[in-house]
């Protein structure tokens, strides 16, 4: 599981305090510690002691499918993160990357144990007018200019998913599909500006499901059972009602993914009751997602069959590398990188090491930059190995994401604009060379910015005939 974070910036004075004598010491004794230098301290390239070279990469497409979307793992309880939003929707017309289908599981609880409806006294009558499941809308990604509506269905979850275990993007809910609880159709082209009226008050855009009457009857029965019912305590309630499963209808042919803050899910019960003084009154009770007891997780399924990307992804990597690379926000496709030239590279001080990747846009005359929300605004880089163990390159924790870069940038050459992603990984390359690490791999993919599955980029691969292939540029000083 990978989650992107901005790390603390290193104190700049500790870098600029590096003196020439320290550099010379490392040159004479070998280099196994951090030797990243600011630009004004990088030695002049004299081709006697200090050189610069550009090295070819070997790049392949791989699947990155291990995003933690619910529960807890290694102390990180993602279900309790207030800024981790869940994807909901379908993309069915992406000819390059294929189809995406996103759904989620969410649980709610009464505000208190031994919940009771607001009645003046025992024996007064009560009528539930409606129960609404409300989930705030945050944003959307995809082709929001497409005027195609999407329908979402609500079902009852029939399996317990513990908040103390881990759920991933590939975790699928178990639901009672024979009994539809609610259905709602939305158009993401206008949804972001829709402000529903609740009474006389305008609300922020939200997904609102009016739940079936059979759910109202069932809930009311459990409450009226008192100590013997599900509303007596939180454990009983979650045993009785394990959660809601919200998913796109099978008939959807959308082109947009919506993002919802189901951390703020509300179940609102609107009802009337008779007062002891006569007449009726109206009121409401609210059940909510409670991070101390409830769980939530996001299921995101990618289907590449029939897409262009499917031609570049397989169980066996192309030994010559792929000519095109596909990078999605996790879960999805990522690019694996090997650098053959580093094998048996002479021991040196690496003064600068920078990877460069160039985007292809549009791809195959298909306007991916317009139709699907633009290229990844930022890619992230990880160090992995032959076993698939992923770690962020240490430059993130030492210097911060701004130093590593990976941001989308544009430059012009001969009147043509190009989009590139660059990564500064000097210390990582230094250790690979110093330790003669023959198992290392690097991996680039979209950053996880709280919007799982968003954004995509098509990049030139190492086997491309174009001269804008990915490359490693190094400035290094040989150790005599």
Positions of predicted regions on the chain:
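Secreted, disulfide-rich extracellular signaling modules
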Residues: 2-480
């Amino acid at each position: 599981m990978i989650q992107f974070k901005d790390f603390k910036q290193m104190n700049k004075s500790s870098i600029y305090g590096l003196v020439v004598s320290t550099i010379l010491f490392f040159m004479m004794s070998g280099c196994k510690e951090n030797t990243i230098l600011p630009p004004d301290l990088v030695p002049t390239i004299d081709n006697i002691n200090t050189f610069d070279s550009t090295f070819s990469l070997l790049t392949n497409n791989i699947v990155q499918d291990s995003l933690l979307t619910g529960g807890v793992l290694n102390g990180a309880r993602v279900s309790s993160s207030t800024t981790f939003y869940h994807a909901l929707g379908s993309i069915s017309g992406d000819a390059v990357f294929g189809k995406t289908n996103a759904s989620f599981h969410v649980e709610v609880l009464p505000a208190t144990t031994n919940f009771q409806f607001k009645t003046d006294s025992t024996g007064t009558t009560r009528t539930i007018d409606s129960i609404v499941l409300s989930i705030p809308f945050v944003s959307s990604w995809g082709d929001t200019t497409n005027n195609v509506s999407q329908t979402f269905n609500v079902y009852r979850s029939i399996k317990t998913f513990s908040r103390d275990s881990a759920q991933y993007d590939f975790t699928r809910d178990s639901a009672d599909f024979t009994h539809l609880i609610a259905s709602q159709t939305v158009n993401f082209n206008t949804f972001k500006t829709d402000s529903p009226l609740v009474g006389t008050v305008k609300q922020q855009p939200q997904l609102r499901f009016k739940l079936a009457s059979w759910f109202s009857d069932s809930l009311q029965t459990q409450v009226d059972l008192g100590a013997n019912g599900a509303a007596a305590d939180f454990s009983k309630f979650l045993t009785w009602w394990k959660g809601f499963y919200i998913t796109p209808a099978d008939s959807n042919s959308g082109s947009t993914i919506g993002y919802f803050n189901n951390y703020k899910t509300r179940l609102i019960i609107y009802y009337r009751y008779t007062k002891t003084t006569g007449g009726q009154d109206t009121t409401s009770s609210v059940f909510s997602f409670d991070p101390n007891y409830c769980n939530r997780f996001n299921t995101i399924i990618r289907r590449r069959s029939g897409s262009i990307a499917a031609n570049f992804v397989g169980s066996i990597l192309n030994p010559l590398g792929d000519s095109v690379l596909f990078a999605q926000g996790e879960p999805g496709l990522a690019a694996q990188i090997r650098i053959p030239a580093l094998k048996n590279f002479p021991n040196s001080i690496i003064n600068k090491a920078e990877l460069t990747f160039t985007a292809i846009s549009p791809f195959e005359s298909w306007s991916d930059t317009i139709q699907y929300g633009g290229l990844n605004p930022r890619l992230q880089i990880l160090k992995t190995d032959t076993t698939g163990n992923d770690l962020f390159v240490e430059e993130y924790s030492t210097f911060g994401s701004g130093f590593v870069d990976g941001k989308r940038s544009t430059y012009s050459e001969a009147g043509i604009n190009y989009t590139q992603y660059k990564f500064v990984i000097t210390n990582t390359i230094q250790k690979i060379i110093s330790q003669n690490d023959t198992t290392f791999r690097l991996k680039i993919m979209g950053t996880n910015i709280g919007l799982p599955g968003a954004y995509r980029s098509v990049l030139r691969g190492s086997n491309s005939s174009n001269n804008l292939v990915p490359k490693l540029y190094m400035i290094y000083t040989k150790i005599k």
